[in-house]
Amino acid sequence: MPTYRRPLNQQQRDILALLARFRFGTCTLFSQSLSTSLRYTHERLRILVEQEYIGKRYDNSYKLAGRSAEYYLLPKGIAMLAENDIASPKLVKLLAKDERASDRFVRHCLSILGAAAQLKSLYGKNLQFRTRSDYAGNTLFPQPLPDGYAFIESPGTEERTHYFIECFDGTMPESVMRATITKHIEFYDNDNWESDTRYPSIVLICRDERLKTKVEKWVQKAVAEGWSDNLHFELLIVTP
């Protein structure tokens, strides 16, 4: 007789939806993002792995490095999201590659999810966070697209405070990080921001205090060489 499996509950579906947007996650990051306990989050992940909705990256090297298990979508989970119009055909193709993703890509995805959780803890539950998969093809934003876009809408008004998020997590060379800072300054200086709203504040997520100090100097130098003093940069430390 086939084994009966209970349908997924909403909390398990929420984990799958997060993986569709952020690609990878850990038990701690899921717990923070969904405001659930580590114990219950771990149990939900165990069931999703057991039922082959998600895969798990973990071996002895993780334990030695004090690194948490990392989770990603498997074909069964991707298919369920596609059937419910949560994953577009283009996103489905990208998600199918995650089982073979590089360590560098995984770490960057975890940094973005960590940034989203940290920003919600700082700015409250009204903050909405979007990833590249949410705004793929958007020509209003600078290119390459920022790692994230977040906004807060004031209740009862159309006023919006918004942010571009860039994660400097040790997965890219210094030249790329500097170019990312310059990208925003040049985009703004060249009047490419075609919106009536103010250009979003740029939040640079740094992996540690040492990098944050470096980035602060790069920002000061790049702003001094640009045309406008109206851009606002904010630096935060987030460790996934």
Question: In which residue ranges do the predicted regions lie?
Answer:
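C-terminal regulatory/effector modules of DNA-binding transcriptional regulators
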Residues: S154-P240
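Active-site nucleotide-donor binding segment shared across nucleotidyl transfer reactions
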Residues: I112
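A short beta-turn/loop motif at secondary-structure boundaries
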Residues: N60-A65, G137-F141, D196
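Active-site metal-binding core of divalent-cation-utilizing nuclease and nuclease-like domains
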Residues: S102-C109, A117-Y163, T171-A179
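Nuclease-adjacent, charged terminal/linker segments that flank catalytic cores
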Residues: M1-L94, D98-E99
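Acidic-and-aromatic substrate-binding clefts and catalytic sites of carbohydrate-active enzymes
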Residues: Q32-R39, G137-F141, R210
